[in-house]
């Protein structure tokens, strides 16, 4: 930032500090305890839309909010007051305000209001309603009170925060000047409530599971590690809620879910944040086909509630979330996109050679035909799945917690839901055979010991729970942040997380 700009900001702050002191000496602030509002701005606008130009309605109203703009013209002034619901104009007439000030110790004069209150300040006012000759519904102010003095200027109201990084670092400024950002987080809150309500209405119970865990399991991801001092014990921030929710199914809860925060010590991008939100849902006596139906119904219902329709636009592309959605196996989609039939490859070497001839990368870490199939899918298919698509029947090597497919050897009963080229949900017919589960987790443990930091460990307590007996179960996980991105037409996950993790700011 240029030195002249810093100097100007410093001078402005000093001026506002002087105004705050002046208000304090007048007994009017500058930091109030409370204010009793009778209305919110949106209610006033809606309830008094019939007020004609030039008319007053002798109804006493009290509103509070932040001053967003101000115009002073001699003995008249016009302020724009914003609260969470909208804005309303304040009509300030010197004679009216001064008359009230002479009889009301809690209210200041017109001159005090117009010289000591700046854009950015929080104020509360009481007055009557008036429709100006230009048709603007206004509160004709009789009394006013400073509620909180702002010492920093607001961003330019016309240009907002042009610096995207600053919008994320100082979200409070972004929310002040951007109605779109406020609407994004309002929709997020409504969406989360709608998901919980949908599940609650269908007899699912939300039960909280530990964030701090002795063994990080339930996903292939690198965990954050911490330490419990009293127990002298290493602990992990959870990378999934899966294994504890399954324990609850073992314990007799037949429909259970948790919507909460997940932590993965991985990279950041427009699609990934190390701390994110998911909902995991488990239903006894169900399989992955049942979970597909549940996923369609849940997402389409919530979309209708939040967006008004199952047909929405994302980044200029029309998306139709009306069920039923397309269903296709991973093998079918890869063969359709590349011509490669992974079902016919005898071993990894043959599959790798075919991939190379098709122009696909062959990473060394993909050490089996199944892992190469997944690589081919990610490279050649994933981004093309714009309309909602259930991708079915994944390789067993990359799905250690999913049940083996009932009719396709080497595959599991698993689907992932893709919308606008992004994975949005993941579900299994859950693996309930404790012996099969132990073998797969031990194979994962071997991969971890060989250097794969994302591989699962062996959770002995979870395996013991499976030996007690778990009923057939369908499980589902939905990424809340990516769903919010879709429902708010947001290009980056940072746009829908109020305070995303960012790289340290470089100091100049």
Curated annotation (Swiss-Prot):
Needed cofactors, names only, are: Mg(2+)
Q: Which domain of life is it from?
A: Bacteria
Q: What is its EC number?
A: 6.1.1.6
Give the primary localization class: cytoplasm
Q: Where does Mg(2+) 2 bind?
A: 423
Q: Where does Mg(2+) 1 bind?
A: 416, 423
Class in the EC hierarchy, top level: ligase
The record's Gene Ontology biological-process terms are: lysyl-tRNA aminoacylation
Co-factor remark? Binds 3 Mg(2+) ions per subunit.
Q: What GO molecular functions are on record for this protein? A: ATP binding; lysine-tRNA ligase activity; magnesium ion binding; tRNA binding
**What is this enzyme's catalytic activity, as reactions?**
tRNA(Lys) + L-lysine + ATP = L-lysyl-tRNA(Lys) + AMP + diphosphate
- Compartments, as annotated in UniProt: Cytoplasm
* InterPro entries, A to Z: Aa-tRNA-synt_II, aa-tRNA-synth_II, aa-tRNA-synth_II/BPL/LPL, Lys-tRNA-ligase_II, Lys-tRNA-ligase_II_N, Lys-tRNA-synth_II_C, NA-bd_OB-fold, NA-bd_OB_tRNA
Where does it sit, as one GO cellular component term?
cytosol
Q: Note the Pfam families from the entry.
A: tRNA-synt_2, tRNA_anti-codon
Q: Which UniProt keywords apply?
A: Aminoacyl-tRNA synthetase, ATP-binding, Cytoplasm, Ligase, Magnesium, Metal-binding, Nucleotide-binding, Protein biosynthesis
The family annotation for this protein states: Belongs to the class-II aminoacyl-tRNA synthetase family.
**Subunit structure, briefly?**
Homodimer.
Name recorded for this polypeptide: Lysine--tRNA ligase
Instruction: Name the encoding gene, please.
Output: lysS
């Amino acid at each position: 930032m240029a030195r002249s700009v810093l100097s100007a900001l410093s001078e402005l702050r000093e001026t506002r500090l002087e105004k705050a002191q002046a208000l304090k000496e007048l007994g009017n602030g500058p930091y109030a305890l409370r204010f009793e509002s009778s209305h919110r701005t949106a209610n006033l606008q809606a309830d008094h839309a019939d007020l004609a130009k030039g008319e007053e309605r002798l109804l006493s109203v009290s509103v509070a909010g932040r001053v967003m703009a101000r115009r002073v013209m001699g003995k008249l002034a016009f302020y724009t007051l914003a609260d969470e619901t909208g804005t309303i104009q304040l009509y300030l007439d010197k004679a009216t305000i001064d008359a009230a000030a002479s009889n009301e110790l809690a209210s200041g004069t017109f001159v005090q209001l117009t010289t000591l209150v700046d854009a950015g300040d929080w104020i509360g006012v009481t007055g009557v309603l008036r429709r100006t000759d230009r048709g603007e519904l206004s509160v004709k102010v009789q009394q006013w009170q400073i509620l909180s003095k702002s010492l920093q200027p607001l961003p330019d109201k016309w240009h907002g925060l042009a610096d995207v990084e600053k919008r994320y670092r100082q979200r409070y400024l972004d929310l002040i000047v951007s109605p779109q950002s406020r609407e994004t987080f309002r929709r997020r809150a409504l969406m989360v409530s709608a998901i919980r309500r949908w599940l609650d209405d269908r007899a699912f119970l939300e039960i909280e599971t530990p964030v701090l865990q002795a063994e990080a399991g339930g996903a292939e991801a690198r965990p954050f590690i911490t330490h419990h001092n009293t127990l002298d014990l290493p602990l992990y921030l959870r990378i999934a809620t899966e294994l504890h929710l399954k324990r609850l199914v073992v314990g007799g809860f037949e429909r259970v879910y948790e919507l909460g925060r997940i932590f993965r010590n991985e990279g950041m991008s427009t699609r990934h944040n190390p701390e994110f939100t998911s909902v995991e849902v488990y239903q006894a006596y169900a399989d992955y086909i049942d979970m597909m139906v549940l996923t369609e119904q849940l997402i389409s219902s919530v979309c209708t509630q939040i967006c008004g329709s199952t047909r929405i636009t994302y980044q200029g592309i029309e998306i139709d979330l009306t069920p039923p959605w397309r269903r296709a196996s991973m093998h079918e989609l890869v063969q359709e996109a590349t011509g490669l039939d992974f079902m016919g490859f005898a071993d990894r070497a043959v599959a790798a050679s075919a991939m190379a001839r098709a122009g696909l990368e062959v990473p060394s870490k993909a050490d089996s035909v199944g892992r190469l199939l997944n690589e081919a899918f990610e490279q050649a298919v994933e981004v093309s799945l714009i309309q909602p698509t259930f991708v079915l029947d994944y390789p067993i090597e990359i799905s250690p917690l999913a049940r083996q497919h009932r009719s396709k050897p080497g595959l599991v009963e698993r689907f992932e839901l893709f919308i606008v080229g992004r994975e949005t949900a993941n579900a299994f017919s859950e693996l309930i055979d404790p012996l099969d589960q132990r073998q797969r987790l031990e194979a994962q443990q071997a991969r971890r010991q060989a250097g794969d930091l994302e591989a699962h460990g062996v959770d002995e307590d979870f395996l013991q729970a499976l030996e007690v007996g778990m009923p057939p179960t369908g499980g589902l996980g939905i990424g809340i942040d990516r769903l919010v991105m879709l429902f708010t037409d947001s290009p980056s996950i940072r746009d829908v997380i109020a305070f995303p993790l960012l790289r340290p700011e470089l100091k100049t």
